[in-house]
Amino acid sequence: MSTTFPGLVHDAEIRHDGSNSYRLMQLGCLESVANSTVAYSSSSPLTYSTTGTEFASPYFSTNHQYTPLHHQSFHYEFQHSHPAVTPDAYSLNSLHHSQQYYQQIHHGEPTDFINLHNARALKSSCLDEQRRELGCLDAYRRHDLSLMSHGSQYGMHPDQRLLPGPSLGLAAAGADDLQGSVEAQCGLVLNGQGGVIRRGGTCVVNPTDLFCSVPGRLSLLSSTSKYKVTIAEVKRRLSPPECLNASLLGGILRRAKSKNGGRCLREKLDRLGLNLPAGRRKAANVTLLTSLVEGEALHLARDFGYTCETEFPAKAVGEHLARQHMEQKEQTARKKMILATKQICKEFQDLLSQDRSPLGSSRPTPILDLDIQRHLTHFSLITHGFGTPAICAALSTFQTVLSEMLNYLEKHTTHKNGGAADSGQGHANSEKAPLRKTSEAAVKEGKTEKTD
């Protein structure tokens, strides 16, 4: 009997409230009933053990229905022929009510089960469709599986397992309540910038929210600065082209190595809707820029541009290159080549200045065509935002060198023309001087003749 009604015997033996004799008398009646129905003891609904293949998965199609008819028919006939088995006859405590309701859910009426299962399957299909459109189906399927592993069996949400059932005189949880609970746990909405945000209950996760603060790798001890890492930046590190694993991501975020460090990081990312599977392999080659967060990479690019502008010897380099070709025949051709190079360099700079790759917490609207913008975005993601500003700084320095070359050539040409004009003028003055001397001598000779 203890194997057939474990919950009832345990409850009758441990309760000492003055009514043990009455309950034991009822249990005696139940024992006779159990002996007469020993053929059904192996399949009794109170001792039925579920297997992993007999409950409805939320990823089955909506037309898949599960109805354990042999258990339902026996449970229905047994309760109606023996009313002492009903929960009201024993007035069991709340824990026993929850156990009986769980058994009623397992062997309930087919219509309630089908409605709950259809609602769950319909909601799952809708969520899968949204996730495919957003490109993040894998990131959220782990969360759905975790819901199933924590008791969301038979199409039921875990929060609804211990709710009172229809046999206790209360309304059962409907499909609307089930859908609302699923939406509260793993709903997807879009923010104003078009990013994916995860809604869990009343908490809304925005891609621009702060994930953590990371100390800089390149700063000295006297000027250590921290850089903010947003959820969107972490998502970019987990997405192509890098697809970093837990070890590399933990190194970027400066997390100390621990026994459960990777698992804790994956759980935190999973709560935010980001998928980081265990044993993942990186997709891109690791460089020194891989270890930098985007804030520090931008800081490095700004310092590089400032150093190029203030410390690079652009004038000395430009004059040195211009002196290599100072022949009169080459000067005109060199000027034309320098002007053409400056024009091409300016066009390149204008193109890079229109790059709208996502960086930090910003996701600007693209200006360029998507065919060229996706390549610039790939380069920006690989360099963590350092590449494009660094190239712009180098191009600006190159423009300064070309300008110095052009100024030196123009100055040298003007100096030569001025020297030639001065030499011609001096030669004319030297020819006029002897004529003036001869005329003065002739005048003096005429004066002497007159005196004579």
Swiss-Prot record:
<dbReference type="GO" id="GO:0000981">
    <property type="term" value="F:DNA-binding transcription factor activity, RNA polymerase II-specific"/>
</dbReference>
<dbReference type="GO" id="GO:0042127">
    <property type="term" value="P:regulation of cell population proliferation"/>
</dbReference>
<dbReference type="GO" id="GO:0000785">
    <property type="term" value="C:chromatin"/>
</dbReference>
<feature type="modified residue" description="Phosphoserine; by PKA">
    <location>
        <position position="239"/>
    </location>
</feature>
<feature type="region of interest" description="Disordered">
    <location>
        <begin position="416"/>
        <end position="452"/>
    </location>
</feature>
<dbReference type="GO" id="GO:0045944">
    <property type="term" value="P:positive regulation of transcription by RNA polymerase II"/>
</dbReference>
<dbReference type="GO" id="GO:0005634">
    <property type="term" value="C:nucleus"/>
</dbReference>
<keyword id="KW-0804">Transcription</keyword>
<protein>
    <recommendedName>
        <fullName>Transcription factor AP-2-delta</fullName>
    </recommendedName>
</protein>
<dbReference type="GO" id="GO:0006366">
    <property type="term" value="P:transcription by RNA polymerase II"/>
</dbReference>
<dbReference type="InterPro" id="IPR004979">
    <property type="entry name" value="TF_AP2"/>
</dbReference>
<keyword id="KW-0805">Transcription regulation</keyword>
<comment type="subunit">
    <text>Binds DNA as a dimer. Can form homodimers or heterodimers with other AP-2 family members.</text>
</comment>
<dbReference type="InterPro" id="IPR013854">
    <property type="entry name" value="TF_AP2_C"/>
</dbReference>
<keyword id="KW-0539">Nucleus</keyword>
<keyword id="KW-0010">Activator</keyword>
<dbReference type="GO" id="GO:0061379">
    <property type="term" value="P:inferior colliculus development"/>
</dbReference>
<comment type="similarity">
    <text>Belongs to the AP-2 family.</text>
</comment>
<dbReference type="GO" id="GO:0000977">
    <property type="term" value="F:RNA polymerase II transcription regulatory region sequence-specific DNA binding"/>
</dbReference>
<dbReference type="GO" id="GO:0001228">
    <property type="term" value="F:DNA-binding transcription activator activity, RNA polymerase II-specific"/>
</dbReference>
<keyword id="KW-0597">Phosphoprotein</keyword>
<dbReference type="GO" id="GO:0043524">
    <property type="term" value="P:negative regulation of neuron apoptotic process"/>
</dbReference>
<feature type="compositionally biased region" description="Basic and acidic residues">
    <location>
        <begin position="429"/>
        <end position="452"/>
    </location>
</feature>
<dbReference type="GO" id="GO:0005667">
    <property type="term" value="C:transcription regulator complex"/>
</dbReference>
<keyword id="KW-0238">DNA-binding</keyword>
<comment type="function">
    <text>Sequence-specific DNA-binding protein that interacts with inducible viral and cellular enhancer elements to regulate transcription of selected genes. AP-2 factors bind to the consensus sequence 5'-GCCNNNGGC-3' and activate genes involved in a large spectrum of important biological functions including proper eye, face, body wall, limb and neural tube development. They also suppress a number of genes including MCAM/MUC18, C/EBP alpha and MYC.</text>
</comment>
<dbReference type="Pfam" id="PF03299">
    <property type="entry name" value="TF_AP-2"/>
</dbReference>
<feature type="region of interest" description="H-S-H (helix-span-helix), dimerization">
    <location>
        <begin position="280"/>
        <end position="410"/>
    </location>
</feature>
